[in-house]
């Protein structure tokens, strides 16, 4: 079924200039709607780990983008205090008490998740925003004013602290999604964007900014890398001097690495304060 969906969506993507809310073949509408439904249920994912490596299903990103071409804006009620006007309805627009009970997650007002995002059991959504295509796995916390961008992948038992920004990647299409693996802590007001991967059991301190051009300096080895935080890293904001010594530029500093047992036993503040 997925291969057939992919073929229809890939073909529709090549002919996307011809598509509009008033002009689209029925099979394309059905394929896109089905793909969004599967994303919403967590049965399909924009990215998944296979044999230790993350693989991006680009056709599902195409399906999300096509859905914007196929839908008109429409008024959406907001509980009597306002209205919205958009193409993508709320994930919870038609939820019943039974649906919420079956989902097993908490949604604290006025948290918003768009249809096509997946929220797993024991997730807590504080007043926050989760965009279409995102996947938030079991036991994670999306804290107040945090944003989970389009197609971002959040692992199990992750804590996204207040005001954290996890970037979205619908455009440009070739960009990979941001991935936060299991058991990570992302400190308040930090930003992770442009397809950066934070590997499991890592701790990102408050106010750390990570993009593909951000230098990641490992103080134990002196190595500078980009785009990936190794498993078990404790990361703080820092600066590196220029070659001529006239100025310094922002970087992220890996101050230490810890294993899962240490991460579980030692408090976050102790990890971040330790030498």
Curated annotation (Swiss-Prot):
<protein>
    <recommendedName>
        <fullName>2,3,4,5-tetrahydropyridine-2,6-dicarboxylate N-succinyltransferase</fullName>
        <ecNumber>2.3.1.117</ecNumber>
    </recommendedName>
</protein>
<comment type="similarity">
    <text>Belongs to the transferase hexapeptide repeat family.</text>
</comment>
<dbReference type="GO" id="GO:0005737">
    <property type="term" value="C:cytoplasm"/>
</dbReference>
<keyword id="KW-0963">Cytoplasm</keyword>
<dbReference type="GO" id="GO:0008666">
    <property type="term" value="F:2,3,4,5-tetrahydropyridine-2,6-dicarboxylate N-succinyltransferase activity"/>
</dbReference>
<dbReference type="InterPro" id="IPR018357">
    <property type="entry name" value="Hexapep_transf_CS"/>
</dbReference>
<dbReference type="GO" id="GO:0009089">
    <property type="term" value="P:lysine biosynthetic process via diaminopimelate"/>
</dbReference>
<keyword id="KW-0808">Transferase</keyword>
<dbReference type="Pfam" id="PF14805">
    <property type="entry name" value="THDPS_N_2"/>
</dbReference>
<keyword id="KW-0457">Lysine biosynthesis</keyword>
<dbReference type="Pfam" id="PF14602">
    <property type="entry name" value="Hexapep_2"/>
</dbReference>
<dbReference type="GO" id="GO:0019877">
    <property type="term" value="P:diaminopimelate biosynthetic process"/>
</dbReference>
<dbReference type="InterPro" id="IPR001451">
    <property type="entry name" value="Hexapep"/>
</dbReference>
<comment type="pathway">
    <text>Amino-acid biosynthesis; L-lysine biosynthesis via DAP pathway; LL-2,6-diaminopimelate from (S)-tetrahydrodipicolinate (succinylase route): step 1/3.</text>
</comment>
<dbReference type="InterPro" id="IPR023180">
    <property type="entry name" value="THP_succinylTrfase_dom1"/>
</dbReference>
<keyword id="KW-0012">Acyltransferase</keyword>
<keyword id="KW-0028">Amino-acid biosynthesis</keyword>
<dbReference type="InterPro" id="IPR037133">
    <property type="entry name" value="THP_succinylTrfase_N_sf"/>
</dbReference>
<dbReference type="InterPro" id="IPR005664">
    <property type="entry name" value="DapD_Trfase_Hexpep_rpt_fam"/>
</dbReference>
<dbReference type="InterPro" id="IPR011004">
    <property type="entry name" value="Trimer_LpxA-like_sf"/>
</dbReference>
<dbReference type="GO" id="GO:0016779">
    <property type="term" value="F:nucleotidyltransferase activity"/>
</dbReference>
<keyword id="KW-0677">Repeat</keyword>
<keyword id="KW-0220">Diaminopimelate biosynthesis</keyword>
């Amino acid at each position: 079924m997925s291969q057939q969906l992919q073929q229809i969506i890939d073909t529709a993507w090549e002919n996307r200039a011809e598509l509009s809310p008033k002009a689209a073949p029925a099979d394309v509408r059905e394929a896109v709607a089905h793909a969004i439904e599967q994303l919403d249920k967590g049965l399909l994912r924009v990215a998944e780990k296979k044999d230790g490596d993350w693989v991006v299903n680009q056709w599902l990103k195409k399906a999300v983008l096509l859905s914007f071409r196929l839908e008109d804006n429409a008024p959406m009620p907001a509980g009597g205090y306002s209205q919205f006007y958009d193409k993508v309805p709320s994930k919870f627009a038609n939820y019943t008490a039974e649906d919420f009970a079956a989902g097993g997650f908490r949604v604290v007002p006025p948290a918003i998740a768009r249809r096509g995002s997946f929220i797993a059991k024991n997730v807590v959504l504080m007043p926050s925003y989760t965009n279409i295509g995102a996947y938030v796995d079991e036991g994670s916390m999306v804290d107040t004013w945090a944003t989970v961008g389009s197609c971002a992948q959040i692992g199990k038992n992750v804590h996204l602290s207040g005001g954290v920004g996890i970037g979205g990647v619908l455009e440009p299409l070739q960009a990979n999604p941001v991935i936060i693996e299991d058991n990570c802590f992302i400190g308040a007001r930090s930003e992770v964007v442009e397809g950066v991967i934070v590997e499991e059991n890592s701790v990102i301190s408050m106010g750390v900014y990570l993009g593909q051009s951000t230098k990641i300096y490992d103080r134990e080895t002196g190595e500078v890398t980009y785009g990936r935080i190794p498993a078990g890293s404790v990361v703080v904001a820092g600066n590196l001097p220029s070659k001529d010594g006239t100025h310094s530029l922002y970087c992220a500093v890996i101050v230490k690495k810890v294993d899962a047992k240490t991460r579980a036993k030692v408090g976050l503040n102790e990890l971040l304060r330790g030498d």
